[in-house]
Amino acid sequence: METAVVYTMLAMTLHEAPTPTIELLAATVAAVTGSWSLVGNGDKNAVDGAAVDAMRYSLSASEFGGIVVIGEGEKDEAPMLFNGELLGQGNSIDWDVAVDPIDGTKLAAAGTKGAVSVIAASERGTMLDCHEVYYMKKLVSSNAARGVLDIDASATSNVLALAKALDVPVTDVRVAVINKPINFELIEEIQEAGAQWVRFDEGDIAMAVAAATEGSGIDLLLGIGGAPEGVVTAVAVRVLGGYMQGVLAPQTPDEIERALQAGYALDKKFELEDLVSGDRHIFVLTGVTDGILVDGVREADGELTIQSMVLDSALDGARLVEVKVDA
């Protein structure tokens, strides 16, 4: 389906949304539509490449002006949606943009749950540029955690404090941690404290946003995951009114050296407002396969039904948007 047609459908769905929310939503829908035929084919690079192509094509026709702060890599490594690439047809560069055309490429390639397409934006100069660091230690929860949890505290202390703040038994606290060797000791500590570990193997943006969303079934996200994904998450958490802290966590001597040369303070505890400041924040997450926040694509009668979560500080509350496009 032509981008203009998708854009018109989305405009009808979110007629009250100011620029550039609809354009960003059109971009994730385009990424999902463009890559859907490859989902489940076992080739994660093919799925991701198709999503990148479609998202970039959609954004190139957008009326706003933005710059990619969190993208697919450096210009010589990523020919499209690279860090520093200018987006849209606007006369001025008014927006920082973070893109992840497919978060969970392995999941999409396998056709298993949890793959999404994500884009986020904030006013120019407000989004932390951390592209030189791959990993970040993160703590994400709802507003109930504000003034209660601290990323420097032990997992046991945080789990017990959150149980008290939520007024529930610690055995009811559900903590998401990505299933990687670097987090195995943390996972063991969480379980020994009596909380429930929610396992996931890839795609920490959706799980982190779920942790900041009341009623999602996830109370807290802890552990080391992607640093760029942490900044994307922060945009959503700002809109949701949640709580988040992060510490950059390079894992190899080369990563540490690169981070230091780039001027990052590796001992700095980033509060939510350090990760993304400003007043206007937009976050869009569109389902590829079924996930914790949105359903995956449904194909029937030559049409794709695509579901998205839209968060915009200029709108009231989260919006669940569903559109149909030609398969």
Predicted regions mapped to residue ranges:
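Oxyanion/phosphate-interacting regions
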Residues: L10-T13, P20, A210-P228, V232-A327
